Amino acid sequence: ILSTGGSDAARSALSCGKKIISAGPANPTFIVDETADIEKAAYCIHKGASFDHNITCISEKNVVVVQDILPKFKEALERLNVYYVDSIGEMLKLSKILLNEDLEVNRLYGGKSADTILKDAGILTDRSYDLIAVETVRIHPFVTKELLAPLIAIVKARDFECALQIAIEAEQGCHHTAGIHSSNSERLRRAAKEFETAIFVKNGCSLDGIGICGVGSTSFTIANITGEGAVTAKDLVRKRRCVCVETLRSYA
């Protein structure tokens, strides 16, 4: 049985007594540190987070940015058709429609366009946008919940150490997808090791991690629960081994 759909689906599948390949919850979080190529980082994050209105489980949901480069990162996003929210008023308007009274996600907006969300929130714009970025705090539901909508949470961090701590906390141990934009090889290595996610992307877009833009076969199912990672045809077929021991040559 191939199970997708989060924790509840995984629990049901795992109790059925058959072989299971199970995907689980996700909250993909990416870091942008002060050594990153800011323009490239913004481009990659926009590309991944705006893909299919951010309804895929691997698309960037949160971005933790070192504070020294946040102004330049914001400008880079705004040049890429991203509506950037850094006012409490607009954040509250978005929270009102995207979250229910109990602060759980309003699933009615899953997969809706950024323009629809902005319009329903009462935020007037003079152009069309394909992604919303909201600067907020690490404990806001936009950070801790997977919205499955074209909105990413931007969290400011004092330095790389702080960014790594916030990002791991935001990913919540799902071990699904994460990434980092940095030119520091030690930070690239360390982040990959500490996240322990099935998909980890260094200096690229989340889509690079599943073969759409990068290398390898394409997979939209990430089995972070049972450990297969990016599921391919090889995980779904019967495996056979054929062995020829002796040579076929004749030594007459």
Q: How should these model regions be labeled?
A:
Residues 122-252:
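Conserved C-terminal structural/oligomerization subdomain of aldehyde/semialdehyde dehydrogenase
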Residues 2, 31, 64, 152-154, ...:
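Structural motif
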Residues 7, 69, 206:
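Flexible, active-site-proximal loop/turn residues at the rims of small-molecule/cofactor binding pockets
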Residues 4, 23, 66, 202-203:
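Generic beta-sheet signal
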Residues 1-13:
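Glycine-rich phosphate-binding loop
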Residues 1-2, 26, 66, 117, ...:
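Buried hydrophobic positions in well-ordered alpha/beta secondary-structure cores of metabolic enzymes
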Residues 5, 36, 68, 158-159, ...:
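Short beta->alpha linker loops
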Residues 10-138:
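ALDH superfamily catalytic-core signature
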